[in-house]
Amino acid sequence: MNLDEYLNRATEMRNEIAAYDEQLVRLLDKRVQLAKNLVELKKEHSRPAYTPIVEEKKIEYLSTLTSYPDLIKMLWPMIMGYSRIPYNERI
């Protein structure tokens, strides 16, 4: 592979990564909004916003769906926790 081929291939890969990044951001936005709505529903019905066992099971399950389970175990608690921040601030 010559330098031009390398540069073209690297650019293609970067563009593909950027497209996935954009998809991830859009999906995270949707997930956070749904989770916030769920927190509000739980609050209206006097249910706890945080159920550790449910979140632990979800993380374990999601970890089985990837070749990078440590990444899920690192990211998902932050993602799920972020959705609870407004609820926790009101307590």
Residue ranges and their predicted role:
Residues 1-91:
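Domain-level signature for soluble enzymes in the chorismate/prephenate branch of the shikimate pathway
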